[in-house]
Amino acid sequence: MAPLGPTGPLPQSFLLKCLEQMRKVQADGTALQETLCATHQLCHPEELVLLGHALGIPQPPLSSCSSQALQLMGCLRQLHSGLFLYQGLLQALAGISPELAPTLDTLQLDTTDFAINIWQQMEDLGMAPAVPPTQGTMPAFTSAFQRRAGGVLVASNLQSFLELAYRALRHFAKP
């Protein structure tokens, strides 16, 4: 698919807001991971990867944001869809534990705000799809351990997602 729409730099105000929102989401995700590590000794996401596959924890694609195929419209759509997916995953973690509920709620709200910001920018550029993305099937965490392990994996995957998003948005900031 050929790149469509504007390919010039994104507004500085949008990029600064994205950077601020990314930092918030990363801090929230780190807080969730640190609490799960300290409280439940779930400290190494790499040890939980197989469980993540078994639970069906999806990871959003960011192929349009990679340096090989970077395109503004596709990347913004994938960023929005990815954040929307993480909203659903975070909702699926509800009930993880009483002490983590406030952190999870904050992470969910900050992720939602970031997704809304991306959507508004797509609308401003005339690039918003006619139909917003759908969430798809979310994993069913059937035990407290699965929710906690899922929390570690979702937070870890979200951090990786945000790192790639950050690099892509910085590229679009260049004149």
From Swiss-Prot:
GO terms for cellular component: extracellular space. Glycans are attached at residue 134. One of its GO terms (biological process) is positive regulation of cell population proliferation. It comes from the Eukaryota. Its main location: secreted. Keywords: Cytokine, Disulfide bond, Glycoprotein, Growth factor, Secreted. GO terms for molecular function: cytokine activity; granulocyte colony-stimulating factor receptor binding; growth factor activity. It is found in: Secreted. SUPFAM superfamilies: 4-helical cytokines. Disulfide bonds join 37-43, 65-75. O-glycosylated. Monomer. Granulocyte/macrophage colony-stimulating factors are cytokines that act in hematopoiesis by controlling the production, differentiation, and function of 2 related white cell populations of the blood, the granulocytes and the monocytes-macrophages. This CSF induces granulocytes. Belongs to the IL-6 superfamily. This is Granulocyte colony-stimulating factor.
